[in-house]
Structures are given as structure tokens and as C-alpha cells.
Regions:
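N-terminal active-site segment of His-dependent metallophosphoesterases
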Residues: 1-37, 169
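Short, conserved active-site loops that position catalytic residues or coordinate cofactors/metal ions
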Residues: 6-8, 33-57, 171-173
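Residue-level recognition of beta-strand->loop/alpha-helix junctions
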Residues: 8-10, 41, 111, 213
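CN hydrolase (nitrilase-like) catalytic-core segments centered on the catalytic cysteine
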Residues: 61-81, 152-247
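Short glycine/acidic-enriched loop and turn motifs that connect beta-strands
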Residues: 87-89, 217-218
């Protein structure tokens, strides 16, 4: 069995040191578990904060933020998908997820392709799109990486599956306007839609789907809806963080992926 841990929390806006301490706090709480993969949310070190994105991006190595996460990976003997940080490269900013192995080594990174420029979102005004899909061979499985709004583009996930992904990981900061967040009926609908999208991606591709979201109010206009989940290839929700600042954990059996793909050879159908 393979142990997966999601860390869902509310980053303190612009305070990298505080947020990194939160990550380590949650890891310490779970050090007695079998940690094969730990996943952090999108923008885990800064929160959603244009000022931080522009004024204090990390360099192409991930800077001190990813250096710290690399130390955590080695200390706790786990692979980590380090949510996302804002990376500056060749005078452009990217929303980048670094993948780190148990030795504390960066083994790859994925730059978000589909930026959120809708319903008041302005990500594309600040950040540039990536142009490469990424799968990574870890010591227990091949994983594919996508970020947040990528989920609205099913073909991306189909391609990751064709590339051999058995697990797809989605760091995210999935948000709604505060008027939606504060209305129980509207929030329930938004969360149900979010859950349905993620379960569909798992089932369409017969993979384990691991998504890690922020939670709670981000600013006076927006809130993150939580519901970080670990989902099986048959859409079973193995763990759900709801709307709390917490961790969720599940043991997964990768033989399930092989079994269902042997029955339904979906990558051979186009």
C-alpha cells in the first residue's frame, strides 16, 4: 500500500516563514504514518497575493521556499509535490509546482498551463503559461501533475494518462466570491460541482486523483472552498478535508489502477 497525505490550510498572506512553519507543523503531526507522498496547496507559501507574486518570486530553483521543503522531504523521508510557488525565469513569472523526492532532490517541475482569467480572475495578467506536460517516476508510481484551473481541460488529463500516470496530483486554490461562500445553499452547490469535477477526472482516466486546496476566507472578496480529496479510480472518495485546516490521509493500492486499465484500455481509445 502507498500512503498519501494532503495538507489543507489557509496560508497567511505574504508571510512565507509562517506558512512554511505551518507545513512543518502538519508534517510533524503525521510523522508516525507511512508517508510516500505529501501534497501542498497552490500558492502555499504566500497565499493568493499579487504583491507577493510580483515583489518576491522564487528563482528557477524554487529559492529558499523550495530549499526548505527539500529539507522537509529528506527529514520526513517522503516525496513532496510542493503545491505551487511563483517562479521568475527569463523575466517572466510562472505558477510552478516542484516535485521533490525522499532525498530532498528536485526531480522535476510543472508550470501551470491554463491560467485563470475569468469572473474577475487576473492570473494571466501577471503570470505566463507553461507549455509542457509533466509526469514523474517516483519510487512507488508514476505521477502526473496539473494545477487548479487545468482541471477544466479534460484533454490534459487524458494526455497525462497516456504518458503513464497512475496518480494525478492537483494542487489548487479553488475560490468563490464571498457572497457565495457565506450563503450555505450557494456554497453547497459550488462544493458539489468541485467534487463532481474531480471524481470525473479520476474515473475518466482510471487513476487515483489527489487534490490539495486552500481553505477559508482569502480576502474581503474571495474564499477557498476546501474539499481537498483523495479519490480512487472508481470515484470513491477515500478522504475529504471538507472546509477545515487539517490533513487527510489514505492508503492506496496501485494494483487497482492496473486492474481497471487491463479491463478498460482507455488509452487505446481516441
Amino acid at each position: 500500500m502507498t500512503g498519501i497525505l494532503n495538507i489543507q490550510f489557509k496560508p497567511t498572506i505574504g508571510k512565507k516563514d509562517i506558512n512554511l512553519k505551518k507545513v512543518e507543523h502538519f508534517l510533524k503531526q503525521n510523522c508516525d504514518k507511512k508517508l510516500d507522498l505529501v501534497v501542498l496547496p497552490e500558492f502555499f507559501s504566500t497565499g493568493i497575493d499579487d504583491k507577493s507574486f510580483i515583489n518576491s518570486p522564487e528563482d528557477e530553483t524554487g529559492g529558499k521556499t523550495i530549499e526548505f521543503v527539500c529539507k522537509l522531504a529528506k527529514k520526513y523521508n517522503t516525496n513532496i509535490v510542493a503545491g505551487t510557488v511563483i517562479e521568475k525565469y527569463n523575466e517572466k513569472l510562472y505558477n510552478t509546482s516542484f516535485i521533490i523526492n525522499r532525498n530532498g532532490e528536485i526531480i522535476d517541475k510543472y508550470r501551470k498551463i491554463h491560467l485563470y482569467n475569468y469572473m474577475g480572475g487576473n492570473e494571466g495578467n501577471i503570470i505566463s503559461s507553461g507549455d509542457k506536460l509533466v509526469t514523474v517516476n517516483l519510487d512507488f508510481a508514476k505521477i502526473g501533475i496539473a494545477i487548479c484551473f487545468d482541471i477544466r481541460y479534460p484533454q490534459l488529463f487524458k494526455e497525462l494518462t497516456k504518458m503513464g500516470a497512475e496518480i494525478i496530483v492537483l494542487p489548487t486554490a479553488w475560490i468563490v466570491p464571498n457572497e457565495v461562500y457565506k450563503d450555505s445553499t450557494s456554497l453547497k452547490y459550488a462544493q458539489e460541482m468541485w467534487i463532481a469535477m474531480n471524481r470525473t477526472r479520476a474515473f475518466d482516466n482510471l487513476v487515483y486523483f489527489v487534490l490539495c486546496n486552500q481553505t477559508k476566507e482569502i480576502n474581503s472578496n474571495l474564499s477557498a472552498i476546501g474539499n481537498s480529496m483523495i479519490i480512487s479510480p472508481t470515484t470513491e472518495i477515500l478522504a475529504n478535508a471538507k472546509n477545515e485546516q487539517c490533513t487527510i490521509y489514505a492508503d492506496i493500492d496501485l494494483e487497482v489502477v492496473k486492474y481497471y486499465k487491463s479491463i478498460y484500455p482507455i488509452t487505446q481509445i481516441d
